[in-house]
Amino acid sequence: MKPSEVISRTDRDGGFIETLQPERGELFYRSCAHGYCRYSSDLWQAELYLDQLVKP
């Protein structure tokens, strides 16, 4: 299976959100900060995850 392709990235507050396109299926999002990542199926949830990850 081919890894998902990163089709966009938004940097914010010391973290980032990437939009990923799998070989088959729907887009999903990866929110990362401070060495931790969370995955979600919608951008709104990805934004909430990033807010949680960047808190000190």
Please provide the spans of the model-predicted regions.
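Generic detector of intrinsically disordered, low-complexity, polar/charged segments
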Residues: 11-12, 22, 32, 39, ...
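A short, exposed loop/beta-hairpin motif centered on an aromatic-Gly-Thr core
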Residues: 32-47, 53
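Short N-terminal "domain-start" leader segments
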Residues: 1-28
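Short intrinsically disordered terminal tails
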Residues: 1-2, 52-56
